Regions:
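Bacterial Sec-dependent signal peptides at the C-terminal "C-region" and cleavage site
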Residues: 16-24
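Extracellular beta-strand-rich solenoid/capping regions of secreted or surface-exposed proteins
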Residues: 45, 49-54, 70-105, 117-136, ...
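Ser/Thr/Gly-rich low-complexity blocks that favor extended beta-strand/coil architectures
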Residues: 142-143, 167-217, 359-397
Length: 608
């Protein structure tokens, strides 16, 4: 796969244009040295504060030798952060806090990464209100992950018992017959898991999320457990990532920043997203990986998405990355709908964050262009502009769930009937996702929900287990905006997606807005204005039928693609059509190569 050079050139030009000669600082001069096992939290904080004071925003580089740097909760930077799509438990224990920093590069030097190792539940890196900052050759990991890996040694299917070996990094104890895993400041009983093939590290066919044998257990010998657990799919040698659904912190948190770059850096493990960026402008990922270390035997990386962008604007560039083994998607780009809960006067309403993992952070400001959507039919009704906005249920932004918003134009009389959401169009990004490999992960590959131009090209989607690419939009459950107007998916290779079922996984490419009352919808959610979604010159290697599922879109092109049928797995998906189209118009399917032939009468189904 060709390497994408776009971002390196762009970053270089940005650096030359905005920066003078960089002043270089060496972390070792502040006592920050690798491989000691000692806590480096305060030493790193001193280095950052010194650079801020001495450089006052002028260009600087903080250089760390390659190797492992340990951080501990007891001396962490204690912060109140509200992180989109994460558990809103505070305070956060932060290892490295970059706050209000300008024109700083934190760089690992030498062979390998400068690897920040967490010793307990912590937020490894926070970038808050920064501008023109870069992480280069930096990695994030933890000594004892909250995901506990086990290997199946014996599966007594007849009697309903499985014997498994717990990975040596894990801490565990048995309490009242329950397997309790723990770290220095956390403990729980794993309830769900993801099963991997021992030899390929791919998720086992048709397993999705599995229940676990963590109750009524017996210790056969240290780290070997026998449990009542009936699942014939888990043959000896299978590897299970035992987990919860908790998302306390991402690996890297970026909020209200501008011109942020992650270059040749990696998240090996995080108890939430690998990278979570919210309400930030212009983000570049080049050679950023969420990947296995390869030297410790782990099959998993992050507890949730590899990268996640909530309410960002400008341009998101993600190229030359490797995303593998995560418990959710490689990338998700969206905004956040507020629900209208009260109409105070003709121009003023109350909008509320609705999801329990998305509130407490900046949503928009004066002058922002917005549009309203009816959540039951997902129809955009009209636009408006913000005149004033302030927290309504709290005195401050942090932790607030409601905003009082005054608009330029009068509001409809029925705006507060519980059916309307508000989308902020100012905070919507253009996206370029290219030259990446996504493999062996749970759920889906890539999610995009933005009205701006989105180009997805030259990527490899390899055994993503669910849908490879999802275009969504949901003002009912996740409350993630919005409609896609201009998406091009080209020159990608898709290998055996859809080996398991997850939410929204109706095709290898699934265009799936959440619309409770599709039958009553009179407008189309995605597409329009002569654009829509173009899928061209891709290769689909698949064992099953569904290629594209689409719902409520005006403008869908599937052109010049190659579909190669294989027998790697038995077909199982409920969707037996190549193209299943619900309320879709202006469709073009042409000049494609299907290895088993194409019959439009049998392979295409229009509904509604």
């Amino acid at each position: 796969m060709k390497k994408i050079f776009f971002t390196v050139c762009s970053s270089l030009l940005l650096t030359l244009a905005s920066c003078g000669v960089e002043k270089v600082y060496y972390a070792s001069d502040f006592g920050v040295v690798p491989g000691t096992g000692e806590d480096m939290t305060q030493e790193v904080a001193l280095a950052i504060e010194t650079i801020k004071a001495e450089c006052d925003g002028k260009p600087a580089v903080l250089v760390l030798e390659s190797g492992e740097y340990d951080f501990y909760p007891d001396s962490a930077n204690v912060r109140e952060y509200y992180v989109s799509n994460h558990d809103q438990d505070n305070p956060k224990l932060v290892a490295v806090a970059l706050e209000g920093v300008r024109n700083l590069t934190v760089k690992g030097a030498g062979e390998g990464y400068a690897n920040f190792m967490m010793n307990g539940r912590m937020l490894p890196i926070a970038m808050v209100g920064c501008e023109n900052c870069k992480l280069e050759n930096i990695a994030v990991d933890t000594r004892v992950p909250q995901i506990t890996q086990v290997e199946v040694l014996e599966n007594d299917v007849e009697n309903g018992y499985i014997t498994y070996r717990i990975a040596p990094y894990a801490n565990y104890r048995i309490e009242n017959g329950y397997l309790v895993v723990y770290g220095s400041n956390w403990n729980f009983v794993p309830g769900w898991g993801i099963a991997f093939e021992g030899d390929t590290k791919r998720i086992i066919y048709t397993t999705s999320d599995i229940g676990l044998g963590t109750s009524g257990v017996q210790e056969v010998e240290p780290y070997v457990i026998r449990a009542p657990w009936r699942d014939h799919r888990l043959v000896p040698g299978s590897v299970i990532a035992m987990r919860s659904y908790a998302r306390p912190t991402p690996g890297i948190f970026v909020t209200e920043c501008k011109n942020t770059t992650l270059l040749n850096s990696c998240v090996f493990y995080a108890e939430g997203m690998g990278l979570l960026a919210q309400m930030s402008e212009n983000l570049t990922l080049d050679g950023f990986n969420v990947a296995l270390r390869g030297d410790d035997g782990r099959y998993f990386t992050t507890q949730a998405d590899a990268t996640h962008f909530s309410g960002c604007k400008g341009k998101i560039v993600s190229v030359n990355g490797l995303y593998e083994g995560m418990m959710d998607d490689a990338i998700n780009v969206h905004g956040t709908y507020l629900r209208v809960v009260d109409r105070l006067d003709d121009n003023t309403l109350v909008g509320r964050y609705m999801h329990g993992q998305a509130y407490g952070f900046y949503w928009g400001g004066e002058g922002d262009s917005v549009q309203f959507v009816r959540s039951d039919v997902m129809e955009i009704t009209e636009g408006n502009r913000v005149v004033e906005i302030a927290p309504y249920d709290k005195d401050q932004l942090a932790g607030c769930k409601e905003f009082k918003i005054k608009f330029e134009k009068p509001l409809p009389a029925d705006i507060a009937n519980g059916k309307y959401g508000i989308e902020n169009l100012e905070w919507t990004p253009e996206v370029y996702f290219a030259g990446n490999t996504i493999r062996n992960n749970r759920a889906r590959g890539a999610l995009f929900s933005t009205p701006k131009s989105t180009l997805v090209e030259n990527n490899l989607f390899d055994h993503t287990s669910g849908t490879a690419i999802l275009l969504c939009g949901d003002c009912n459950g996740w409350f993630e905006t919005g409609a896609c107007r201009d998406v091009v998916i080209r020159n990608n290779r898709f290998v055996n997606a859809l080996t398991s079922m997850f939410q929204f996984t109706n095709g290898i490419i699934s265009i799936y807005p959440e619309i409770p009352d599709l039958a009553s919808q009179t407008k189309y959610f995605h597409g329009g204005d002569g654009k829509g979604v173009v899928i061209e010159n891709n290769v689909f290697e698949t064992f099953d039928a569904p290629i594209v599922y689409a719902k409520s879109i005006d403008g869908l092109v599937f052109r010049g693609n190659k579909v190669v049928q294989n027998n790697d797995f038995a077909p199982f998906h409920w969707n037996k059509y190549r193209f299943l189209l619900d309320k879709v118009v202006n469709v073009t399917i042409e000049d494609n190569d299907f290895s088993t032939g194409f019959d439009e009468q049998k392979d295409v189904m229009y509904r509604y």
